[in-house]
Amino acid sequence: MPSVERDDLGVVPAEAADVPGVIDLIARVFAEYRFVWDPLTEVPDLLAFDRHYRAPRGAFFVVRRNGRVVGSVGVERGAEATAELHRLYLDADLRGQGRGRALVEAVLRWCRASGIGHLVLWSDTRFDQAHALYERMGFRRTEARDLAGDPNQTREYRYERAVGPAVEAPGGPGATGPSGRPLGPPRPGA
């Protein structure tokens, strides 16, 4: 009987056992962009996973395909009611399919449940698809910085947004138009 490959691709909380897979994913993305790869300097947070990404300090989520990590994102609590999004990576063949959005939404849910009101992130200027996603999800680009001494000559953009309540798609439950009237077909008897 032929084996059936499992292709769940759902967003799930990461375990410490996922760290090698996350590091492999980041190495694949670095290779795609022809970045210099040194895990000791590029992913120190992952090498101290529990300190950075265990509740209540933070959280980490992954997407797996056939047991292999193919997507990741982390969030770490900062000062006051602020958190920082880290490590949003997806294998190239999965980009543009909504999985990046699902990963960021998992971070936003964690922030809401943790009383976080503001989310920030830094992203390499070369990650255009990620920037488009962040902007579609309500993040604002606020500044740029160069990373001194970085072998990849990295310049990063800072993005931020208020966490706020969950945002529903137009026409979703409870959605209203500019007049304040509900969107969608009228309810019977209305």
Where in this protein do the model-derived segments appear?
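Active-site acidic-Proline motif in GNAT/NAT acetyltransferases
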Residues: D91-Q97, T125-R126
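C-terminal "cap" of GNAT-fold acetyltransferases
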Residues: L47, G117-A190
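Conserved SAM-binding loop
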Residues: V11, G96, V120-S123
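Short coil/turn segments at alpha/beta junctions that flank glycine-rich nucleotide-binding fingerprints
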Residues: Q97, S114-G117
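Acetyl-CoA-dependent GNAT
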Residues: E5, L9, P13-R87, D91-D93, ...
